[in-house]
UniProtKB/Swiss-Prot annotation:
Zn(2+) binds at C146, C149, C159, C162. Binds 1 zinc ion per subunit. Coiled coil: none annotated. This is Methionine--tRNA ligase. The keyword Kinase does not apply. GO terms for cellular component: cytosol. Belongs to the class-I aminoacyl-tRNA synthetase family. MetG type 1 subfamily. Its cofactor is Zn(2+). It comes from Coxiella burnetii (strain CbuK_Q154). Is required not only for elongation of protein synthesis but also for the initiation of all mRNA translation through initiator tRNA(fMet) aminoacylation. The gene is metG. A motif ('KMSKS' region) lies at residues 332-336. One of its GO terms (molecular function) is ATP binding. It catalyses: tRNA(Met) + L-methionine + ATP = L-methionyl-tRNA(Met) + AMP + diphosphate. PANTHER family: METHIONINE--TRNA LIGASE (PTHR45765), METHIONINE--TRNA LIGASE, CYTOPLASMIC (PTHR45765:SF1).
Length: 546
């Protein structure tokens, strides 16, 4: 029986183009990449797209500080982000940018459809304005004293000390973060999207299982009051796309950012004629669409985005997978403590597969924060990857190469043991499918323990010294390497580079779930090369020291 290939489109949230990618960002990109690689290993068609989130006041200001045009800053960050994501073996079909002709075209199309439907209205609002820099100030560019707890130097919308949220007008002694001037209130006409028109659609969509239960329950709290209209415009000066037929008005970055997913696929379809844009985005599409996002941007992805798509006549996501934050050694990442670790800094010192494995060993389908504890990281890599997984191959390979010219035996001495490893396939694939990577890793490592126990019990090193036991040594090591082959297939979504090295060593076809069941018998393998190095504490310690 053959099952039909699934047609899947996966996105990860777009990294913002005003700073480097850090290990917190990598949680999401690694989580999504593992899932994509798993789907491909199962034989499904899975496209994986992302891109640079390139618009907004913050990018305009950062570019000014660096003496660059915003376009140059975006191009520079795009190159750096693509380098770092590639360094962590994140394999996007397209890593594009929201500052693109495709995104402009789609943003204008969606806005026009929203407007034609009567979902856009204009309203005059009062905003904080910097009289020196002559710019309207986003909340994050206003600093002052918290009106609740009195903490100084807090943002215009939230206090990082007590957690209170408020409007910039409530802030005590507010100043512009750009000039130090006291902001004034200034009126401006803005455009709003009537989100409340989509209340029933959103309730129904949220109840239909497209979100993790924790996320769905949290979102339902927003419906205790009427959904407020969403301000989708910003005033010049601003870096973004101008709103058609509205002088000096720009689309708010959060309007065109998720449209960037569509633009990235549209751009890919120009590179690859086999990719059909409409097949993935048209209303009623039978393909699957998954967004991987952090818990801080759920509101945009699970309320605004589905409502916009519905209004504009596009399909809605199959699911939105939400993850928590990363802490380092139990605390929020901090530059002063040396725990703000950029992706590039990590890659200067350690293998990306160590972190891919560690994150996988911690990730679940829950919206939980995960902690990168550096002592635990060292212990987990050395105990699991080196001590259990790689050790199994190194214990068997030498005997096969030296004593038997690289030739495996023509049958397995313990076919039942091999079969028992195969019987865990469904459990492991279910865990991968449901994002319960930590449970998958636990099962895989318990199999690695069993495989090593088998080698411990059979003692090929002792058998090799006995007379007339050559065939038994070959058989035991053939069994061990075939168990190692199964483990490698199970770990391949997490450890793609190591899996490729193993395929070269085993001299076999690319490992996947279709050829999982077939053992390598009467087959020649290549000389074994070390697959991974033990992680030294002093090497890991370099992560927290620039």
């Amino acid at each position: 029986m053959t099952t039909e290939k699934r047609q899947i489109l996966v996105t990860a949230a777009l990294p913002y183009a005003n700073g480097p990618i850090h290990l917190g960002h990598m949680v999401e990109h690694i989580q999504a990449d593992i899932w994509v690689r798993f789907q491909r290993l199962k034989g499904n068609d899975c496209l994986f797209i992302c891109g640079e989130d390139a618009h907004g006041t913050a990018i305009m200001i950062t570019a000014q500080k660096q003496g660059l045009p915003p376009e140059a800053l975006v191009a520079k960050m795009h190159k750096e982000h693509a380098r770092d994501l590639g360094g962590f073996l994140i394999e996007y079909d397209n890593f594009y940018t929201t500052h693109s002709p495709e995104n402009r075209e789609l943003a204008e199309l969606i806005y026009t459809r929203l407007k034609d439907k009567g979902d856009i209205f204009a309203k005059t609002i009062s905003q904080a304005y910097d009289p020196v820099k002559e710019i309207f100030l986003p909340d994050r560019f206003i600093r002052g004293t918290c009106p609740r707890c009195g903490a100084k130097d807090q943002y215009g919308d939230v206090c990082e000390v007590c957690g209170a949220t408020y409007s910039p007008t409530e802030l005590i002694d507010p100043v512009s973060a750009l000039s130090g001037a006291k902001p004034i209130e200034k009126n401006s006409e803005h455009f709003f999207f009537s989100l409340n028109r989509y209340t029933q659609l959103l309730k129904k969509w949220i109840d239909a299982g497209h979100l993790q239960p924790q996320v769905a329950n949290k979102l339902k709290e927003w419906f205790s009051e009427d959904l407020k209209p969403w301000d989708i415009s910003r005033d010049a000066p601003y870096f973004g796309f101008e709103i058609p037929h509205a002088a000096n008005k720009y689309f708010y970055v959060w309007l065109d950012a998720p449209i960037g997913y569509m633009a990235s696929l549209k751009n890919l379809s120009k590179q690859r004629p086999s990719v059909n844009f409409d097949a993935y985005w048209k209303e009623g599409s039978q393909t699957e669409l998954y967004h991987f996002v952090g818990k801080d941007i759920v509101y945009f992805h699970a309320l605004f985005w589905p409502a916009m798509l519905s209004s504009a006549g596009f399909r809605l996501p199959t699911a939105i997978y939400v993850h928590g934050y990363l802490t380092v050694n139990g605390q929020k990442m901090s530059k002063s403590r040396g725990t703000f670790i950029t992706a590039h800094h990590y890659l200067d010192h350690l293998s990306p597969e160590y972190l891919r494995y560690y994150y996988a060993a911690k990730l679940s389908a829950q919206v939980e924060d995960i902690d990168l504890n550096l002592d635990d990281f060292i212990q987990r890599v050395n105990a699991d990857l080196i001590g259990k997984y790689v050790n199994l191959a190194s214990r068997c390979a030498g005997f096969i190469t030296k004593n038997f010219g690289g030739k495996l035996a023509n049958e397995l001495p313990e076919p039942d043991l091999y079969e028992s490893f195969l019987q865990t396939e469904q459990t492991i694939t279910d865990y991968y499918e449901s994002l319960n990577y930590s449970k998958a890793v636990r099962v895989i490592m318990s199999l690695a323990d069993r495989a090593n126990q088998y080698i411990d019990a059979k003692k090929p090193w002792a058998l090799a010294k006995e007379i007339n036991q050559e065939a038994q040594v070959q058989a035991v090591c053939t069994q061990g390497l075939n168990l190692f082959k199964i483990l490698t297939t199970y770990l391949k979504p997490i450890l793609p580079v190591t899996a490729k090295k193993v395929e070269q060593f085993l001299n076999c076809d690319e490992l996947n779930f279709a050829n999982l069941k077939t053992p390598l018998l009467d087959h020649s393998v290549n000389p074994f090369e070390p697959l991974m190095q033990r992680l030294l504490p002093e090497t890991a310690a370099q992560l927290t020291h620039e």
